[in-house]
A protein has these predicted regions:
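A conserved regulatory-domain signal marking ACT and ACT-like small-molecule sensing domains
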Residues: 1-72
Length: 72
């Protein structure tokens, strides 16, 4: 589950960063938009099942906050 700025291009930037980190988006659901923030559930296949690199890449994007991760 992630929160990001609710403005054009934010989700595209997030998706590009996931791909650059080797992640493969398997599902995406826009949960809500509130107070200028978008909240999305994203299912990502991560190489080697270790999300550390992905979390570091996402943490470097301004305004993006990883709220929770759930291993599958």
């Amino acid at each position: 589950n992630v929160a990001l700025p609710d403005r054009p291009g934010s989700l595209g930037l997030l998706a590009s960063a996931i791909g650059a980190a080797g992640g493969d988006i398997r599902a995406l659901a826009v949960v809500k938009s509130e107070d200028g923030r978008g909240y999305d559930d994203i299912t990502v296949a991560v190489p080697g099942n270790d999300p550390t690199d992905l979390l570091n890449v996402l943490g470097a994007i301004g305004g993006v906050e990883v709220l929770s991760i759930t291993p599958l």
